[in-house]
Amino acid sequence: MLENNTTQTERKNPFFEPYNTPHDTVPFNRIEIGDYEEAFLEGIRRDDEEIEKLVNDPEAPTFENTIVRVDNENGENYYDLLSRVSTVFSCMLSAETCDEFDALAQKMSPILTKHANDVKLNKRLFERIKYVYENHRELTAEEQMLLDNCYDGFVRSGALLDDEGKERLRNLTEEASLLSLQFSQNLLKENKAFTLHITDEAQLDGLPETAREAAALAAKEADKEGWLFTLDYPSYSPFMTYSTQRELRRQLYMARNTEGTHDNTENNLEICKRLVNLRREIAQLLGYETYADYVLVHRMASNAKNVYKLLNDLIDAYRPTAVEEVKALEREAKQTEGDDFVMEPWDFSFYSHKLQMREYNLDAEMLRPYFELSKVIDGVFGLATRLYGITFKESKDIQVYHPDVKAYEVFDKDGSFLAVFYADFHPRKGKQGGAWMTEFQGQWIDRKGVNVRPHVSVVMNLTKPTDEKPALLTLGEVETFLHEFGHSLHGMFANTRFESLSGTNVWWDFVELPSQFMENYSVEKEFLRTFAFHYKTGEPMPDDLIERIVRSRNFMAAYACLRQVSFGLLDMAYYTQKEEFAADIIPFEKKAWEKAMVTKQLPDTCMTTQFSHIMAGGYAAGYYSYKWAEVLDADAFSVFKKNGIFDQKTAQSFRDNILSKGGTEHPMTLYKRFRGQEPTIDALLERNGIKR
């Protein structure tokens, strides 16, 4: 036992000093939850101190002494404390949260929003920025973009408002920030609260062995007998696709599609309504008629009219085929169930699978044995090597935040260090559903000319391994991996001076191009042959099976397109509101996407209350971006199809002109530099087999 006067080494907050880790990676093992709040508050204090120095600088404002310092990525310190702690905390909140994290997020959200407002609404600071904006020297394209972004960022945050307007804006943005956080926390709790517990093995009828094993493992982990199914995609999707138990499918479907609507503390209905109104008020306070007008100024689409044109063009092109696809499903169901059978939404995946089996003799479970996760990783990494010459080396020296996470060092084709890549593969308690890419550190060039390399992370919810089998993925999960890996390449290839313009820091309707571009490879036979080997026998996937994958790529493609379009219509319906939004969410939703719907709508289901993208994920008035980027990716990939899907010269052009440039120039300028022309919808229609 130590005596009271024993001198002990005082523990230091890891965020306050150099990490002294490989590549300055996050020392997760040394970070305690109390470190976050301390670092947030100290980071705010340091920011305030730097801003005070800046506004009192006696020298005339210049690009270097004002804009670069405001950008806060190339300051005197080699890192920005507030940015440093924020990136780690944000990742943990979505990938490895707990009640303490949630409570801290609730506490810090208004404090951080207030600080952001204090910066953007600082009159003396804006005067310096405005002076540079109006009196700057000749700038490079990247410097001009940074200056424009800086000035516009302050104006769009209320710098030109009077004091009363600024105070009103503070209140609106702080409330919106808190409600967005509440929305996400409610949704996560709703998602994790529901389970379908089965103890009668007969009720597993139709389910493949992989789904049964995963459910048995879930039950075991929950100290329950039998089998446990959840609303996480790797559990939910196989049940809806294969289970012959129609009533259980209904229960699972209704649980997932009514999240956030129940009479409990996790209800999101009023939160959604309030967020729509808050964003409209913010936009109108800043001189825009609608929130969509406010957002689309800095998008390739430019305005709501162009967004609606894209969505309506897609409806016109795809709807006839989508209607026929649904009729084919209904015929398939009636052949089995009789002419009086009425297909419900919880039957859709089940009969879609049956129809796919009849037409192509293909189903996800046939493919799983060939998509062992470790082999898929090799295939995806190998694709990057073949295209760009980069290589990946797993590192046990780089700390991770959970045992599921793997860390890799990435090296460029000349052998130089390129990036750190983290991969977090499987669902677990405290982890949000879905898949996303994030960064623990961006890329920039510091004052000494050192190219600081990025640390990127992809977070997914792929099928878990069981006691009997390794993680065996579906083709859809392989596609998800490729999608997020495309985002990560955008981050890893970043090569810009300023971090705020690097990697994925681009306009939102351009950001999905690199990710959706990579999805194209999931049905390319030459790529599949590089890694699709049976996990037991080592035999390659038979050519006949690969051919069936390629032939079936457009199965239900028109329906899938209209489903995405419907989400885009819903998003635009909310954020083109000019007056106070007072409608009931659920009926409003049904009306908003009606023209894109080709299947039955249920009165109680609701997408809005779980639509994280547009309520809490930055895609408000921007969900159309997925279809916009799909036009771009189909057009871009057509060049690879012409020159060879592994053509290194084409890949180098894609890297040099798009992936490495970030947001340093207008996206269309970058795209045309790669493609030689603006994109058209033709390549997308051709890829999907749609004729106009």
Stretches with model-predicted labels:
Residues 28-40, 63-70, 264-268, 307-314, ...:
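Membrane-entry segments of alpha-helical transmembrane domains in multi-pass membrane proteins
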Residues 463-482:
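Short pre-active-site segment immediately N-terminal to the catalytic Zn-binding motif
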